[in-house]
Amino acid sequence: MTQMTIGHLYTSLHAGCASAVARVLEAHEVEVEFVDLDPEDIEDALEQGEVDLLVSAWFPRDEKFSGPGSRVIGDLYQPQISFAALKALGPVNTLTSADVDRVIVADDSREALEKALKQLPALSALPMEVVGEAALIARLEKAQSEGEAPLVVATQPHAVFHASLLALVEDPGQLLGGEMSARMILREDVARKADTDLLDELSEMMLGNKVMSALDYMIGVEGQDPDEAAEAWQRGRLIPRDA
């Protein structure tokens, strides 16, 4: 197979992941094209053959995208919605308004937070502020400079977890849900034509949350092109914090 189209969400996180996967394809002499997708476009793009490889789907949340004409491969990183704070705190179920004064939640994590707050009555009355994923670092830097004490809810990986702003807050009851698996969805007709060594390499490819947070930071905060960030990863120049 000489050409493959990668579909991915338009965020810096997913663009970085797609570019890293493209590096593996190109090493096997596969020409790569990219298609940016809105979340509501993914299912149609797969069904209509507009993309050959979706990078990436978060399982089990995105199982609906893996129909009978597709093959699910790999385990690139492990997304998880997490509680965090600007300083070390005890487990989330022990916190009160004496410990935190507000909740700042990334937009993609809001639904999970609203469910969790039903089991956290001591925190449910706190003011909630929803911010876009791209605006989270700036908002937390402002909170830090103004002496605020927010409880933060965001999905790892994210650039904010590369910026050394946050300490994770333990969630012993997994109120935000458990760890997911970022996997690739390959059209079955494409998989049958693909080189078996390539499929094996994609299946074994591991980026991990720290690398993905670093990629997200390089692209979303430092403004690097996703291909340049992927090259830095491939050449070992991308160093995750606390690696």
What are these regions (language model features)?
Residues 1-13, 30-35, 100-104, 202:
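Short, well-ordered beta-strand elements
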Residues 2, 135-145, 152-154, 158-161, ...:
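An extracytoplasmic/periplasmic, membrane-proximal ligand-sensing/linker region
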Residues 12, 33-47, 128-142:
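Short helix-initiation/N-cap motifs at beta->coil->alpha
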Residues 20-28, 97-99, 105-130, 232-235:
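Ligand-binding cleft/hinge of the Venus flytrap
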Residues 55-67, 142-169:
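A ligand-binding cleft/hinge motif common to bilobed small-molecule-binding domains
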Residues 70-77, 153, 163-178:
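Short beta-strand->loop
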Residues 71-114:
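A conserved helix-loop-strand patch within extracytoplasmic ligand-binding domains
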Residues 82-93, 180-196:
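A bilobed periplasmic-binding-protein/Venus flytrap-type ligand-binding module shared by bacterial periplasmic
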